[in-house]
Amino acid sequence: MGNCNKPPKRPPNTQTSAAQPSAEFRRTALPSLYGRYNCKCCWFADTNLITCNDHYLCLRCHQTMLRNSELCHICWKPLPTSITVPVEPSAPPP
């Protein structure tokens, strides 16, 4: 009775949700036969790159794209939302 401001109860989602896309963060991109890698969006950044499907994005462009949508503006696939940072040695082995 009366006005109720509670949101309607929804049944639990029985579908399996797709895994969140994951990306690897690299301070410097792997060496290439065709020269250095750059961010495919701004073409300026060549360090601190994130792998997106078949290209690299810098952190700045990645965050800008995530603010606008969940899809990459270049390849139209889901943007990585979790970033894994590999352990890089700080010095060469003895």
Swiss-Prot record:
Motif PTAP/PSAP motif — list its residue ranges. 89-92
GO terms of biological process kind: viral budding from plasma membrane; viral budding via host ESCRT complex
The yes or no answer to whether the keyword Aminoacyl-tRNA synthetase is present is no
Q: How does it sit in the membrane?
A: Lipid-anchor
Could you say which residue ranges form the zinc fingers (RING-type)?
39-75
Record region (Disordered): 1-22
Which Gene Ontology cellular component terms are annotated?
Answer: host cell perinuclear region of cytoplasm; host cell plasma membrane; membrane; virion component
Task: Please state what the annotation says regarding this protein's domains.
Answer: Late-budding domains (L domains) are short sequence motifs essential for viral particle budding. They recruit proteins of the host ESCRT machinery (Endosomal Sorting Complex Required for Transport) or ESCRT-associated proteins.
Biological role? Plays a crucial role in virion assembly and budding. Expressed late in the virus life cycle, it acts as an inhibitor of viral transcription and RNA synthesis by interacting with the viral polymerase L. Presumably recruits the NP encapsidated genome to cellular membranes at budding sites via direct interaction with NP. Plays critical roles in the final steps of viral release by interacting with host TSG101, a member of the vacuolar protein-sorting pathway and using other cellular host proteins involved in vesicle formation pathway.
Instruction: Spell out the protein name for this chain.
Output: RING finger protein Z
**Originating organism:** Machupo virus (MACV)
